[in-house]
Amino acid sequence: MASEEQKEIPNQYSYLWPYSGTFSAVNALWAATGDESYKTLLDNKVLRGLEKYLDISRSPAGYASYINTASQSDRFYDDNIWLGIDFTDAYLNTKEEKYLKKAQLIWEFIESGADDKLGGGIYWCEQKKVSKNTCSNAPASVFALKMFKAIRDSSYLIKGQELYEWTKKRLQDSTDYLYFDNISLDGKIDKSKYAYNSGPMMQAATLLYQLTGCSYFLKDAQNIAKACYNYFFINFIPEEGEPFKLLKKGDVWFTAVMLRGFIELYQTDHNKTYINSFNQNMDYAWEHVRDEKGLFDIDFSGRTHDDRKWLLTQAAMVEMYARLAVTK
């Protein structure tokens, strides 16, 4: 079929990235509640569906961006990293080997995306090795450090720290502690700043502090947290009630990933300023950002509305409510 014709036909199923958000959402619900019905949902529905994206025709095996019964699709390292983190969290929650084996399979794929160009780091896409992105390195550090917590293999701790240091050296904005989006092989930096880039670096720094006791990492995490709060929140005056710091309009899933970093840091330094702000935002969103079907818009002020709702946005909201419910 001609590519122009294909453009006119919508995908029958979700791409891997938004589908993976449902894994994160159900994982968070299960961890928050201990309700076995969520584990059943995860095993019998979410993960069964996820296997439709597993590509074993290329080596090493990894998850492709679209289902394996369609034409072969690209494989993105960051897509796989988010899955690896969730499988590792599921293992830490249960000690069931099936989750660990999946995490290890994904880690092998992630390692295949690293080389010495630019002094290290992981590419963004297996088929387009033209840039190394914060989104394929910062969460890879988180993934490695969680794997170390899971099985105490020191190689993961070493790799997690290496990825953290590489990303900090290559992609941090030294003027404000936030992170740029990517660096191309010619050294050109895309200076866009997204919540899902700085958030995992905050989380990785906090994990490194927890695992090493080195205060340098805690200071890093706190600097990133303050910078994120200043950049990704704005002063907001609601029609009723007191002014508060509102999350900027943008990708809600990016915000959910950033929240993971804030929660990790709060559980370490117990500064609740940022968590309180997230709670205010989520309470306000519940009252002002849902449509008649209960689905959320991306504008947390409630003043603009989306014509279409995205699976990943809804999954991100579930994840954030679940995580905040047990963050005391």
Protein language model regions, located:
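CBM-like carbohydrate-recognition segments
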Residues: 1-25, 29-78, 132, 216, ...
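Structural recognition of the beta-strand scaffold that forms the well-ordered cores
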Residues: 15-24, 82-85, 135, 140-141, ...
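Structural helix-adjacent loops and short alpha-helical linkers that scaffold large soluble proteins
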Residues: 29-43, 89-105, 147-162, 174, ...
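Extended ligand-binding groove/face enriched in aromatic
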Residues: 39-150, 154-158
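Active-site cradle of extracellular carbohydrate-active enzymes
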Residues: 134-140, 144-148, 156-207
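Flexible, glycine-rich surface segments
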Residues: 189-231, 237-238
